Design a protein with these regions (language model features):
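Extracytoplasmic and endomembrane cell-envelope/extracellular-matrix remodeling and assembly machinery
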Residues: 1-26, 30-31, 70, 75-78, ...
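Alpha-helical scaffolds flanking conserved acidic
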Residues: 34-41, 58, 106-112
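A structure-centric signal for secondary-structure junctions around beta-strands
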Residues: 37, 57-58, 148, 222
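Short, surface-exposed glycine/acidic/tryptophan-bearing loops
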Residues: 50-72
Length: 271
């Protein structure tokens, strides 16, 4: 009998792959990228869209502020699309393609650059006098030297879970179908939850990009609210009434330019 794995975080990762894996795979396939890259956000964030490193890297794909902005992600007081699984995955695909092309299709070097920045990788290549990752590796930062082998190991573990003795401690929840509604008015999470008859926690879980439990209005085209497909009809029907509920608690939203100071570090890459 296979052992039941209960170590901290594994069930959450397995659940995350079950719930988000298809979305990531679809994006990778659409961008003609290796499907094994779906395990990269497992290594980066444990598939937690709210993950934030001590250096400020944020979201599933752990984008720094400068990299996120270079990939056209919205980052302001109300919205941080680095935390949006769909938007950040599209940005990650664009970024990974750029790194792949930069290193002539060598994924070992491209992934090292994803972790350490192309500046650090190019410096290591010059010092090694080679573009063979395994020769370049000893000139890379310690974390990056371990990063690519760790991803290779992770791919094997999750592609061959029986061989590795990995099984979840409880059955995984089935994937559920999601839909998106574009909102042009300010809608609080509690109002959205009231309209669709779902808990606020579900709204928050499906919409991690909003920083203040509010979908902000005032933008051409509106901002997306992600919800389960079976909740769309009830939500649209009940939304007008829900917007009147405790309307005085809904804050005014403005998108004035923010001043952000970022200190450039050796090896940083803009995108």
């Amino acid at each position: 009998m296979l052992p039941t794995v209960t170590n901290l975080g594994l069930d959450a990762v397995l659940y995350g792959l079950s719930a988000r894996g298809l979305t990531v795979e679809e994006a990778l396939d659409r961008h003609n990228l290796p499907l094994e890259l779906k395990y990269l956000p497992v290594l980066e964030s444990g598939l937690n869209p709210l993950a934030r490193s001590g250096a400020g890297a944020t979201g599933l794909w752990q984008f720094m502020y400068a990299t996120g902005r270079s990939q056209k992600l919205n980052i302001n007081s109300w919205v941080d699309e680095r935390r949006d699984p769909q938007s950040s995955t599209e940005a990650a695909c664009r970024f990974l393609k750029r790194l792949r092309d930069m290193y002539d299709g060598d994924w070992h070097l491209a992934l090292a650059a994803y972790n350490a920045g192309s500046g650090n990788v190019n410096k290591a290549i010059r010092r090694a006098g080679s573009r063979d990752f395994w020769k370049v590796r000893r000139f890379l930062p310690r974390e990056t030297a371990k990063y690519v082998p760790s991803l290779i190991a992770l791919v094997y573990l999750f592609e061959h879970p029986v061989d590795a003795g990995l099984v979840p401690s409880q059955p995984l929840a089935p994937r559920f179908t999601l839909d998106t509604v574009m909102l042009r008015r300010n809608v609080r999470f509690d109002q959205a939850a009231r309209a669709m008859g779902r808990p606020v926690a579900e709204v928050a879980q499906l919409n991690p990009q909003y920083r203040k439990e509010l979908i902000p209005g005032g933008v051409d085209g509106g901002w997306p609210l992600v919800l389960s497909v079976d909740a769309v009809g009830p939500f649209l029907e009940a939304l007008p009434e829900a917007l009147e509920w405790e309307a005085e608690k809904t804050p005014e939203v403005s998108f004035e330019p923010e001043v952000t100071v970022y200190r450039v570090r050796s090896g940083d890459v803009l995108g």
